[in-house]
Amino acid sequence: MMMKISFNTCFQILLGFIVFIASITLLGRIFSRPSKTKDRCRQLPPGRPGWPILGNLPELIMTRPRSKYFHLAMKELKTDIACFNFAGTHTITINSDEIAREAFRERDADLADRPQLSIVESIGDNYKTMGTSSYGEHFMKMKKVITTEIMSVKTLNMLEAARTIEADNLIAYIHSMYQRSETVDVRELSRVYGYAVTMRMLFGRRHVTKENMFSDDGRLGKAEKHHLEVIFNTLNCLPGFSPVDYVDRWLGGWNIDGEEERAKVNVNLVRSYNNPIIDERVEIWREKGGKAAVEDWLDTFITLKDQNGNYLVTPDEIKAQCVEFCIAAIDNPANNMEWTLGEMLKNPEILRKALKELDEVVGKDRLVQESDIRNLNYLKACCRETFRIHPSAHYVPPHVARQDTTLGGYFIPKGSHIHVCRPGLGRNPKIWKDPLAYEPERHLQGDGITKEVTLVETEMRFVSFSTGRRGCVGVKVGTIMMAMMLARFLQGFNWKLHRDFGPLSLEEDDASLLMAKPLLLSVEPRLASNLYPKFRP
C-alpha cells in the first residue's frame, strides 16, 4: 500500500538524514577526493558544492519553481554547462549552442537513453512508447513505426482533409464568438484547435464519447473539455525534477509532494477516454474483419503487420503511444500562437507585414490552405522568433548517457541526465544580438538573401523541435498545425486587446513560461461573410 506524506514531513526526514550524515562529511571528502592527475582527465562540468550523499538535492527541494534553481546556479557559476549531483545522479545542464550540437550530433549515440522516472513510467505505461522507452530494440521498433507509417508523407496527406475540417471549424468558432460579442481567450481557443486536430488525426473524430456532446459552433463538449483538461494536468507534471526520482531507491513507495500520484491519476483519466475507442477499433480490425479503408493513425497502428504476418504493435503499446501523442501534440502550437499574437499586437509593424504577406500570397477571396504554407515565410519567421524567446518548456526532454563520454571538454559519467535549456539557448546574448527583442527578420536572412523558412533549427541556437536520435518525429505535422492556426487567425480577423485585459505587458510566468495573464482579445471579421464556413462535427 502506497504511503502518502506531506512535503513538510518529507523535508523533515531529509533534514534529519542530513544531520545524521553531517558528522562524516570531512571523512567522506578526504576519502572521495580523486588525485589531481585523475581530476584533469575526468573533470566534471562546474557545479555547486553539495552535501555528502544527497549532493545538491536539499537546495533543489527548497527552490520553487525547481527550474529556477538551474537558471540561477548557471548564472552564478557564469558557465554554459554545469553539473549538479542529486543523491548520486549527475544532472548536466547546457546553455550553449555549440555544446548542444555536440550532444545531439557527435555524442548522439552516447546520450540516446531516457531516464527511468516515476512520472514518465506512468505516462509510458512502463516505458512502452517511443518517447519514454530506453534506447534499444523496442525503441527502434516504435520509432520505425511512427516515422515510416504514422508520420509518413502518405499518411499525413491522407489526413489533410481532417486537418482542414478543424481549420474551418476554428474560423467558424471565432466568427460565432464575434456574432455573440464574446471575448476570445486565445490560449483556450488555441488549445481547442490543437486538441480537435489531434483527435481527428488520431481517432478520426473530435469527440471521445458516443453521445457526441458538443455544440454546433465549435465548442468542446463536457467530456472533451475534461479530456483536454487532464491532458494538460498530465503535461504539467513533467517539468518537475521531482525529488522522488532521485531518492526512490531509498524512499520507494513514499508519495513525496504528491507529484507521482497526481501524474498517475491524470494519466488514468486520459486513458479512460482513449481506451474505449481503441478497444472498439481493435475488435473491429482484428476480430470482425476490419473497415473498408485505413482512415486515421489508430487504424494504421492496429493494422500494421511484420514480415511473418503478425501484428506489429500490441493493444497496450497502442494505448500508451496514444497517451503520448495527446500530451505531445497540443501545448507547443497553443503556446506559440498566444505569444506570437501578443507580440504582434505589441509590435503593430510586425502584424502589418504578416497581413501584407498573407494578402499577397493568398488574397482575400479564399481561405489560406496547407499548400500556401511554404510561401508564407514571414509568418513562419514569426513562429520561429516566438520559439526562440517564448519556448513552451524550460528544457528539452532529458537524455541519459549510455556510457562515459565528454561534452565541452568535460567528463560526463555513464547514467548522467542531460538537460538542454530552451531559454538558455534562445535568450543567450552569446548567440543572439539583442536577444530579448522580438525581430522575425533575423530568421529571413541566408547569405544575405531571403530563403525559404522552416521551423526546424538545426544549429541548436534555439529549440523548436528536438533533434537527434530521440528527436521529435512530428516536425512536419507540428509545422502545419502551427502555421495554419496563425494564418487562419490573421487572415480571417482583425484583433485588438479586450478592455478587461489592461495594458499589454507580455509578462511571463516563471514556472510554466506561459503568458502570465491569458491573452483576451476582441475580434472583427476581415473577409467577406460568405467565406466563413459552418461548423462540421
Swiss-Prot record:
It is a single-pass membrane protein. Pfam families: p450 (PF00067). GO terms for molecular function: heme binding; homomethionine N-monooxygenase activity; iron ion binding; oxidoreductase activity, acting on paired donors, with incorporation or reduction of molecular oxygen, NAD(P)H as one donor, and incorporation of one atom of oxygen. GO terms for biological process: glucosinolate biosynthetic process. Its EC number is 1.14.14.42. InterPro entries: Cyt_P450, Cyt_P450_CS, Cyt_P450_E_grp-I, Cyt_P450_sf. Induction: By methyl jasmonate. It is found in: Endoplasmic reticulum membrane. Highly expressed in hypocotyl and roots. Lower expression in siliques, stems and leaves. Barely detectable in flowers. Expressed only in the vascular bundles in apical plant parts. Its cofactor is heme. One of its GO terms (cellular component) is endoplasmic reticulum membrane. It is an enzyme of class 1 (oxidoreductase). Keywords: Endoplasmic reticulum, Heme, Iron, Membrane, Metal-binding, Monooxygenase, Oxidoreductase, Transmembrane, Transmembrane helix. It catalyses: L-hexahomomethionine + 2 reduced [NADPH--hemoprotein reductase] + 2 O2 = (E)-9-(methylsulfanyl)nonanal oxime + 2 oxidized [NADPH--hemoprotein reductase] + CO2 + 3 H2O + 2 H(+); L-pentahomomethionine + 2 reduced [NADPH--hemoprotein reductase] + 2 O2 = (E)-8-(methylsulfanyl)octanal oxime + 2 oxidized [NADPH--hemoprotein reductase] + CO2 + 3 H2O + 2 H(+); an L-polyhomomethionine + 2 reduced [NADPH--hemoprotein reductase] + 2 O2 = an (E)-omega-(methylsulfanyl)-alkanal oxime + 2 oxidized [NADPH--hemoprotein reductase] + CO2 + 3 H2O + 2 H(+). Belongs to the cytochrome P450 family. Catalyzes the conversion of the long chain elongated methionines penta- and hexahomomethionine to their corresponding aldoximes 8-methylthiooctanaldoxime and 9-methylthiononanaldoxime. This is Hexahomomethionine N-hydroxylase. The lineage of its organism: Eukaryota, Viridiplantae, Streptophyta, Embryophyta, Tracheophyta.
